[in-house]
């Protein structure tokens, strides 16, 4: 496990250099979307339409930020549960999106797509939306304004603190942690 400062876009080479458990400080452009936005984007792709942003090597943050206070770039911007996007994540990766930021476990189908398309799943700290918002230096609404907090935004972040939860080889920090706990627990119990 390493501590790394990385700059986007998340190229295939950069994605392959990351490992489950790595602590990263992310700088660059990311896009926001939640389930309603993902559904619209996947429907647009099914109709042969272009997405509101170029998905090539893109990183998508699963967030619905609160409104910005006067003088602030954005309001609280904590991660939402990633499982809500599991139905759409393989499609998004198939068109070039590579990074996903959220919280919680992912379905096996998403992990398989990550292995196929060199995707990386980053975990952000739930409950720390105000802290994460401080890393967001620019925010621009780019599509689906009618979705309110779930509208698509283009953000520029600096040193956003994340952890690689699942790397592009399918290594999963959640599973590794569970296995390490059980191994230690069984050792203590004499099993």
Where are these regions (language model features)?
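Feature captures the catalytic cores and cofactor-binding loops of soluble hydro-lyases/lyases
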Residues: 32-33, 37-160
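C-terminal binding/interaction regions
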Residues: 26, 134-191
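Short, structured beta-strand/loop micro-motifs enriched in basic residues and often containing a Trp
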Residues: 1-10
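A broadly conserved detector of short glycine/acidic/proline-rich loop/turn motifs that flank catalytic sites
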Residues: 10, 30, 65-67, 159, ...
